[in-house]
């Protein structure tokens, strides 16, 4: 009996162990069902893989803060349903051809500067107009709270691209190799300009515009090919332009506003919820960059001071003279069609220039 009981006990323990093993198997199945089936469902959703390019270098703040941070935001908000392969330095298409390349479908997303495409979409030049806008906040307000954003966006849609949002990056400054204390001092100087309105601005100042991409500026300064440049304030620090040009003219010409575009066919092919995510992310990112750019300008001025860079402020009569000349010669050049004129009129009224 004892042996049987022991034997029965052993068999009973094995039976209990078998039941426990079965229990854990069932529990494991339940846990797998709870935790992994939703992932399988997500994995079964369509993932939209896109190519995104910045025409600027991989370490440029225009690329890292302007584009890559936006791409991160979209990937997060879409829960991975939109994913980006990232390119920079114009590796998919050079700056001046990049918008055309985007619109024919060579890639899906582009960050670039609208002045490169002045002949393609003149309406996109509005934020390049010098001295028109009194703050970056004013530009944000014009884009999202007036007809300006809608009208500019419509023009690009007609060409085959969708603006996902404006990018606020920095003050737009003129820096020179030698100190220029008066407006007359610009006469005959060769100043790098981005084209379009930027080139007309340089001409109005009495200088000669030279069209160069950002990567060529340092060497051109070093060789004396140019005497100065129009470019974002932060570039003077980031690209060490202060080694060649230590004088920054004040007040600034305006502000650097780039756009992020998406190929229209790509955008139209997305579900409505993902389209909304893209546009919402664009507005959120614009608000972030507005704050970031203002703080960045303050920080950069402090850093440049340690390298001997000096702001050179034009006299009030020179500034007034320059503004009047710009209003007469440059601002009206934006009015290439009725839509341009309406956009400019809204901006002039908004900024109190009437």
What does each of the following model-derived ranges do?
Residues 13, 44-139, 147-148, 154-354:
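N-terminal secretory/targeting leader peptides
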Residues 1-49, 354:
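Short, low-complexity disordered leader/linker segments with a strong preference
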């Amino acid at each position: 009996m004892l042996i049987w009981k022991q034997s029965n006990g052993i068999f009973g323990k094995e039976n209990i162990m078998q039941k426990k093993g079965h229990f854990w198997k069932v529990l494991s199945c339940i846990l797998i069902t709870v935790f992994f089936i939703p992932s399988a469902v997500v994995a079964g959703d369509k993932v939209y893989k896109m190519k995104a390019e910045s025409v600027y270098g991989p370490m440029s703040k225009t690329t890292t803060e302007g584009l890559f941070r936006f791409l991160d935001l979209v990937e997060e908000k879409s829960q991975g349903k939109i994913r980006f392969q990232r390119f920079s330095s114009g590796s998919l298409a050079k700056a001046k051809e990049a918008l055309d390349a985007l619109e024919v479908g060579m890639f899906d997303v582009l960050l670039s500067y609208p002045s490169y495409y002045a002949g393609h979409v003149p309406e996109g030049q509005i934020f390049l107009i010098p001295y028109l806008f009194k703050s970056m906040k004013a530009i944000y307000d014009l884009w999202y709270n007036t007809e300006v954003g809608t009208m500019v966006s419509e023009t690009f849609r007609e060409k085959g691209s969708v603006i996902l949002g404006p990018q606020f990056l920095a003050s737009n400054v003129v820096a020179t190799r030698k100190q220029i204390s008066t407006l007359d001092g610009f006469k005959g100087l060769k100043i790098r300009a981005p084209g379009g309105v930027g080139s007309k601005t340089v001409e109005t100042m009495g200088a000669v515009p030279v069209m160069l991409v950002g990567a060529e500026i340092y060497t051109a300064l070093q060789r004396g090919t140019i005497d100065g440049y129009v470019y974002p304030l932060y570039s003077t620090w980031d690209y060490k332009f202060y080694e060649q040009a230590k004088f920054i003219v004040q007040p600034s010409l305006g502000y650097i506003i780039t756009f992020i575009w998406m190929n229209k066919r790509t955008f139209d092919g997305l579900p409505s919820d993902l389209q909304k995510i893209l546009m919402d992310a664009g507005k959120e990112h614009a608000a972030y960059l507005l704050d970031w750019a203002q703080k960045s300008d303050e920080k950069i001025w402090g850093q440049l001071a340690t390298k001997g860079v000096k702001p050179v402020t034009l006299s009030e009569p020179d500034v007034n003279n320059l503004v009047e000349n710009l209003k007469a010669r440059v601002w009206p050049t934006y009015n290439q069609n009725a839509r341009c004129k309406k956009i400019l009129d809204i901006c002039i009224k908004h900024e109190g220039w009437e």
